[in-house]
């Protein structure tokens, strides 16, 4: 697949610091792009109005541009594109992707208000409710599933669902990330893509913590580098994107 040569000719794979995602997206999109505003504000209340006003996400701008670029490439090559996100928190990443795409459908999996902190889960902050996130995103082109990720993924498999791009951003222990990845595998189309968050050894203190804990997402993606069935497409900030080859 000629994703790099066709739409990413500016050092996309290497993640060079002089590469401007914002400039690239504006030049590439015929219908424009909405500037991402994704910095958290601890003083803001957990309201639907706040969710509608911004992109509540812990992804950097570059990370969102990267996922969007892959999604838009897929939109160019097929009629409908299916995106799956495991661990959506407030839905900010899906909101960003939805507002800047035309022919993609989005499925998000999360525990939402049912989440309870535990020793084996790296998440600990307050979660939005499923109703809040759905009202913020709108139900057009969006499906939200509440429950434990592996079980939700199995349910999707039973319904013969397939996805073109899967983004795994749930529990960041190695064990949980691997379980989410393995449960997602049957859902990824041939030549589809799977992306992981928090898998850079030096990008943030969070990532360093996950690696020290049990290897975290970084260890799993490092293992995929040696897997002949997957090809690393890009690594930007804390996100790595792989293409499924078989």
Q: What kind of region is each of these model predictions?
A:
Residues 63-66:
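N-terminal pre-P-loop "Q-motif" helix
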Residues 1-56:
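Membrane-proximal basic amphipathic "stem/tether" segments
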Residues 44-58, 69-246:
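S-adenosylmethionine/decaboxylated-SAM
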């Amino acid at each position: 697949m000629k994703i790099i040569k066709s739409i990413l000719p500016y050092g996309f794979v290497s993640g060079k610091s002089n590469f401007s995602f914002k400039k690239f997206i504006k030049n590439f999109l015929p219908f424009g792009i909405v500037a991402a505003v994704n910095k958290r504000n601890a003083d803001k209340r957990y309201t639907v109005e706040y969710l509608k006003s911004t992109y509540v996400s812990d992804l950097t701008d570059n990370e969102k541009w990267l996922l969007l670029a892959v999604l838009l490439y897929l939109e160019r090559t097929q009629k409908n594109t299916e995106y799956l996100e495991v661990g959506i928190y407030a839905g900010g990443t899906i909101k960003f992707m939805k507002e800047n795409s035309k022919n993609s459908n989005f499925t998000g999996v999360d525990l939402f208000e049912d989440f309870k902190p535990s020793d084996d889960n790296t998440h600990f902050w307050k979660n939005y409710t499923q109703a809040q996130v759905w009202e913020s995103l709108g139900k057009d082109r969006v499906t939200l599933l509440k429950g434990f990720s592996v079980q939700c993924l199995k349910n999707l498999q039973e319904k013969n669902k397939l996805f073109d791009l899967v983004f795994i951003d749930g529990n960041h222990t190695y064990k949980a990330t691997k379980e989410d990845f393995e449960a997602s595998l049957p859902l990824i189309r041939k030549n589809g893509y799977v992306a992981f968050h928090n898998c850079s050894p030096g990008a943030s203190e969070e990532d360093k913590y996950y690696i020290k804990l049990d290897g975290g997402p970084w260890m799993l993606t490092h293992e995929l580098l040696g897997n002949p069935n997957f090809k690393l497409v890009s690594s930007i900030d804390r996100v790595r994107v792989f293409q499924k080859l078989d």
